[in-house]
Amino acid sequence: VRARAQGYPMDDAACTLETDDENLKAVFELCRHTIRVGVQEGYLDCPTREKGEYSGDLAVTSLAQVYLSGDTRLLRKAIEDWLYSANLTPGLLAVFPSAFQQRIADYSLLMPEVALRDYAHTGDKAFLRRTCDAAGALLKVFEAYAREDGLLEKVVEGWNLVDWPANLRDEYDFPLTLPIGEGCHNVINAFYIGAVRA
């Protein structure tokens, strides 16, 4: 019997945890191993099912991967691919590179924050300027849905995803139908505020 293991190369000395708490050590090692084997040539939470990077996975996983490895190359490539999707829609795609042109409004709004993450680790002002141009175009897309008070309503620029099972939504009962229901959807507005602040 043979098995082949592969993963993104990581220097274990790039990020260490000093604690006497054995449970915390175990959690840290589990997280490190998860990033090592779960991050391959892209940020995929299920490489056997997903054939492109989802920007939501990128936003979460890159945070841990960059701190654990000190390596920003994969993050930069993912942002480049994400920005390239603006050639198809200024609202950005949720999956890239991919022929599957899915738009998830919430995920698109993560781009400015992820771009700032790259800058925080690289200090690359030229790349930050490029991402600022894309972020400006992205925010213009969403400003079209702004009410008088600045909150967004009836955002139809892609799917409004609340990635929680219905039984775990803590009675959040906003109609997440396609197209989105009437009213002010808190989740998309939280992402929008985060994008504007970034």
Q: Model-predicted segments: where are they?
A:
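Short glycine/serine- and small hydrophobic-enriched flexible loop segments
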Residues: 63-67, 113-120, 194-198
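Short helix-capping and inter-helix turn/linker motifs at the boundaries of alpha-helical repeat units
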Residues: 52, 105-106
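Hydrophobic alpha-helical segments with strong N-terminal bias
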Residues: 44-47, 97, 108
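Aromatic/His-enriched, Gly/Pro-containing loop or helix-boundary segments
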Residues: 94-103
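Active-site acid/base region of carbohydrate-active enzymes
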Residues: 5-30, 36, 43-92, 121-187
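Generic alpha-helical secondary structure signal
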Residues: 26, 30, 77, 106, ...
